[in-house]
Amino acid sequence: MTTKIERRVKIKYRVRNKISGTAERPRMSVFRSNKQIYVQIIDDLSGKTLAAASSLGMAEKVAKKEQAAKVGEMIAKKAQEAGITTVVFDRNGYLYHGRVKEVADAARNGGLKF
C-alpha cells in the first residue's frame, strides 16, 4: 500500500513525462506545504526559473485559500512583467482542488492562459 506522498510523487513523474515547458509556453509548477504555497514558472529547455512567487513574505495572516489566491495574482503579475502570457499548468501531483485550484483561478483572472 502506498502512502499519500508516494502516490503524489508517482503522479508527479507520470505527468512530468507528458508535459514540458518551453520559452514560448513555460511550465507553471505549484508546490504546497502545510503552511505555505510556492509557484514557479519554469523554462524546462534551459532549466531556468522565469518567475516565482510564494506566500512566505506575506505580512498579514489570512486563510490558506485566500493566501493561495494572492500568490496566484502575484505570479500572474510577475509573468506579465516578464512577457509571459501562456503557460502549461503543472499541479505537481496534487489534486486540482482547494489551494491548487485557487492558485490556478487567480492566475487565470490575472491574465495568464493555460
UniProtKB/Swiss-Prot annotation:
Alphabetized InterPro entries for the sequence: Ribosomal_uL18_bac-type, Ribosomal_uL18_bac/euk
Domain of life: Bacteria
Keyword terms, alphabetized: Ribonucleoprotein, Ribosomal protein, RNA-binding, rRNA-binding
Cysteine-cysteine disulfides: none
One annotated GO biological process: translation
GO molecular function, one term: structural constituent of ribosome
Cellular component terms (Gene Ontology): cytosolic large ribosomal subunit
PANTHER family the record matches: 39S RIBOSOMAL PROTEIN L18, MITOCHONDRIAL (PTHR12899), LARGE RIBOSOMAL SUBUNIT PROTEIN UL18M (PTHR12899:SF3)
Subunit structure: Part of the 50S ribosomal subunit; part of the 5S rRNA/L5/L18/L25 subcomplex. Contacts the 5S and 23S rRNAs.
Function: This is one of the proteins that bind and probably mediate the attachment of the 5S RNA into the large ribosomal subunit, where it forms part of the central protuberance.
Family, similarity comment: Belongs to the universal ribosomal protein uL18 family.
Name of the protein this chain belongs to: Large ribosomal subunit protein uL18
